[in-house]
């Protein structure tokens, strides 16, 4: 029987954990500790920890994997495999070297493209037409290990980070189940990554959340959906932060300065970019509830002709 330790944190990892546990059994789940969430700062377990408890799997939630305690807990399992999926911590070499059949990662990009912590967000923001999942051996260098298998999917115009997370999570679970028998037998392929083709997708910073309209409409649209539904991009409206949850491309040309609200649409309001208009469909003004953009502009029709700013 194959002994497996699974490491993961967000919703992306949960279908992978469930499928892995159903088919092989997971001996230990390692996830991030509970964190304060929301205005009331309620201590909340990450989705993988919640799933592990529901599945009745032993759970360990360390602040760091670089401690002697973490090494002992992993080594005591005597695992054949460590499998990670969006765990959120770098594993030291002494952990990576414990399992007899290797340490694997389910990464949400077509490596070596989009190494790093935000491959799904960055694929959308960059305007990529396709993305995918890679099963790889972990190495000391982040996301640089040998590739075992990969599967690509198309990025559609109606995708955002949330929909791509869901799609790639399912792809990752399926690809892992297809690949694991060969890994366990030791008959899988492993292909070194081409370093010259590597690109990097670091975690989203606060500065990345500012939506600028001073660029082509397609770039604005990609930026908005790449941050939706989290962490959500924003602009400024008369000194107040305006979050933009959703938008659409139009075939309308711009005849106003970038950032200008030019009028209403059937389901929102239109904002000028450098080469066309972006249709904003869901917003939230600071201190207010999230609202569909048509209701927002109907209640604030005096904003038509004003300009959304980039400060804040």
Walk through the language-model features, giving the residues of each.
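Acyl-group handling in specialized metabolite and lipid biosynthesis
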Residues: 202-215
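Donor/substrate-binding cores of folate-linked one-carbon enzymes
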Residues: 22, 81-200, 207
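Short amphipathic alpha-helix with an adjacent loop that forms part of the alpha/beta core around
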Residues: 68-78
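N-terminal Rossmann-like dinucleotide-binding module
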Residues: 1-40
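Glycine-rich, highly charged phosphate/nucleotide-binding loops
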Residues: 60-70
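N-terminal beta-loop-helix "entrance" segment that forms/cooperates
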Residues: 35-55
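Proline-aspartate-enriched helix->loop->beta-strand connector
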Residues: 26, 78-80
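An anion-binding loop in the catalytic cleft
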Residues: 214-312
């Amino acid at each position: 029987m194959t002994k497996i330790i699974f490491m993961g944190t967000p919703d992306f990892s949960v279908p992978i954990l469930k499928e892995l546990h159903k088919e092989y059994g997971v001996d230990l789940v390692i996830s991030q500790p509970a964190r304060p969430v929301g205005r009331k700062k309620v201590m909340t377990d990450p989705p993988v920890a919640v799933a592990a408890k529901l599945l009745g799997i032993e759970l360990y939630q360390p602040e760091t994997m670089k401690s002697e305690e973490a090494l002992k807990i992993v080594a005591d399992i005597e695992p054949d495999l460590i499998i990670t999926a969006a765990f959120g911590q770098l594993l030291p070499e002494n952990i990576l070297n414990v399992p007899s059949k290797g340490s694997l990662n389910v990464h949400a990009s077509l490596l070596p493209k989009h190494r790093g912590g935000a491959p799904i967000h960055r694929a959308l923001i960059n305007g990529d037409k396709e993305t995918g999942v890679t099963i790889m051996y972990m190495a000391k260098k982040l996301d640089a290990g040998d590739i075992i298998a990969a599967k690509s999917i198309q990025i559609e115009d109606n995708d955002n980070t949330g929909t791509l997370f869901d799609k790639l999570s399912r792809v990752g679970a399926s690809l892992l189940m297809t690949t694991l028998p060969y890994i366990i037998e030791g008959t899988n392929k492993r292909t070194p990554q081409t370093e010259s083709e590597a690109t990097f997708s670091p975690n989203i910073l606060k500065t990345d959340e500012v939506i600028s309209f001073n660029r082509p409409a397609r770039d604005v649209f990609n930026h908005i959906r790449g941050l939706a539904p989290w962490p959500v991009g924003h602009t400024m409206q008369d000194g107040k932060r305006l979050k933009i949850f959703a938008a659409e491309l139009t075939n309308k040309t711009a005849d106003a300065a970038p950032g200008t609200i030019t009028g209403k649409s059937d389901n929102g309001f239109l904002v000028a970019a450098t080469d066309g208009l972006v249709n904003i469909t869901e917003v939230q003004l600071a201190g207010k509830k999230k609202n569909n953009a048509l209701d927002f502009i109907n209640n604030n029709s005096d904003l038509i002709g004003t300009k959304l700013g980039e400060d804040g």
